Structure formats: C-alpha cells, structure tokens
A protein has these predicted regions:
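Conserved Rossmann-like nucleotide-binding pocket used by diverse enzymes
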Residues: 2, 26, 52-54
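A short beta-strand-turn-helix
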Residues: 3-20, 62
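Short pre-active-site segment immediately N-terminal to redox-active cysteine/selenocysteine motifs
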Residues: 19, 26-29, 72
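Hydrophobic beta-strand anchors of alpha/beta hydrolase catalytic cores
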Residues: 22-23, 53, 76
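Typically the conserved alpha-helix immediately C-terminal to a functionally engaged Cys/Sec
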Residues: 34-47
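Conserved acidic residues
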Residues: 57-59
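Structural micro-motif
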Residues: 62, 68-77
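Non-catalytic, surface beta->alpha helical segment in thiol-disulfide oxidoreductase systems
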Residues: 80-106
Length: 106
C-alpha cells in the first residue's frame, strides 16, 4: 500500500472512515518535507494494516492546513477515531511515528 494523496474533497472522509490516520501536511518546495516523504513510504509498509498514512499539499489546499492550525511544514497530525490525537512538527523519524501510532492504538 502507498501513502495516500489527499485533497479537500476526500480529507474528511479519510479522517472519519479510518480508525487511525496520520496526515503529512507538506509542500513540494519544502526541503524538510522532501526528507519526510521516504520515511512515510517506509512507514506505510510497516503499518498499512493498522493505520492510514496520507499527505496533503498545503499549497494546493490551504484551508485544511488552516483548519488544523498548521503553521510550519512538515506538520504531521495523527487522528484517532476522527479526532486529533497528536501533532508533530518538523521531520519525524520512522520510530517516532511508529510509537505515536502504537500509542494511539491502545
């Protein structure tokens, strides 16, 4: 399974129709965001049965970033049962993200 690409049209459905969702708010010009991408690609292989991993381009879809208080990118927001469980700002390593997902599953 691959990292899903979200738009303003499928964002709410993705959050509300999955138990655990990790969304990377990013932009194509952002150097740290480019570093985060391969980490998420690797993470999705590990957690695809437990969580949905997705990304949303804040340049194309600024409203959701504003809605969730994203002020810097990359920002990763972990949702559990449709609610924000954790917000992580800056590049996050796979172990940190895996720990956050595992904690949300408890």
């Amino acid at each position: 399974m691959a990292v899903q690409t979200l738009t303003h049209e499928n964002l709410n459905d993705t959050i509300n129709n999955n138990d655990i969702v990790l969304i990377d708010f990013w932009a194509p010009w952002c150097g740290p965001c480019k570093m985060q991408g391969p980490i998420l690609d690797k993470l999705v292989e590990t957690v695809s049965e437990k969580a949905t991993i997705a990304k949303l381009d804040v340049d194309q879809f600024p409203a959701p970033a504003s809605q969730f208080g994203v002020r810097g990118i990359p920002t990763l927001i972990l949702f559990k049962d449709g609610d924000v469980a954790q917000t992580l700002v800056g590049v996050q390593q796979e172990g940190t993200l895996l720990s956050a997902i595992e904690a949300a599953l408890k």
